[in-house]
Amino acid sequence: MNSGKGGPPRRAMIMETPVAHSVPPHVPPHMVGDFNLFTSPGMMPTPNGDPQAACAVVHDGPPIFYSPSNTRDGRGTWVITRAQDQRRVLQDPESFSSHRSIFASALGESWPMIPLELDPPEHGKFRSLLNPLLSPKRVMALETAVRERSAFLIDRIAAAGTSCDVMKDFAFPFAVNIFLRFLGLSDDRLEEFVGWANDLLHGDNVQRPAAARTIIAFVDDLAAERRAQPVDDFMSFLIRARIDDRPLTDAEIRGTGVLLFVAGLDTVAAAIGFDLNYLARHPDDQALLRREPSRIVLAAEELLRAYPTVQMIRVATKDVDFDGVPIRKGDYVSCATMIANRDPAEFSDPQRIDLTREDNRHTAFAYGPHRCLGSHLARREIVVGLEEWLKRIPPFRIREDTAPVTYGGHVFGIENLILDWS
């Protein structure tokens, strides 16, 4: 088995059971459900699990229900189960705000990750500032570097033997390296960065705030370095940038840098892991993509539909009558991509993964004004990763004496994926 030299060690997943808050008095008892993304069947770390498929159970119920414990800190949320209704929420920032201070709350603070947790009009200003950095044209300019890094890692795996842990040896080193390259940094601290992200997104109540403080210190130190000696990288761009004819404040630079850090590390690696896990279990689909690699782009979209990793939560800014449901100001509203993407009203036979599916209106990258800023880069990383893997690794399968461990929660993922091609 590949020793994974240079690859970050994967830690055992810690999934705390959220402590549920009481159900608000305005929630009718018949609208309270027992499903949540943390402790329902398939959500806890599960060998050979499929947490996205497990979410489909909600489609047997009402279009909206109240889950008393559906956030990492045990907050209750309304759960929107229909893709069409999720789109209504996600494109209505006037009624449903994005400002939650997810990261800052780990420190007992309240400041936004930018632009993710901003509402109009401020959101539009920062989005316009940042869009060119992750435009299709800019992503194409990174294509050579993305492909070279992917090929390097896979060739190293192939040279080491006929088995590897994809998450440790490929998915995370690949995604983190591209993130570091975008920041203008070397990958000398790759293992450190993965550890921070793991503690922040999946750690306990001690690890999370410690990781948050470490990430903030890193972002602040990098900003100070670039102020003193700017180079051609993302942080230097933020230092030079102007909004409303003024430079960005320290808090705005921090909020933007933190978002890039959090968003750039875990989700792409998880997507690659879920994709290769699927192909390892479905040799006919694996063979199809080997015979016709031109299908990989379309297949990647179907795999994004089937295996998204995040839920978007909005906060009601006012009392809303949502098709007769009494959403009150301050209520949390969950729009989970893994629920919308298994909606039978939106997709024909949604539990079946069809790599030839066309007109794929999935919401893996969210929807509306907050559609993922880095979606173009993420897509290229996933497609290139699959192309190079299938080109360089013979037909593969899950190693017989192992079981990939999947999990739901704040960000869905796969802890380990040991493949074999002997």
Task: List each model region and its residues.
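Cytochrome P450
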Residues: 5-422
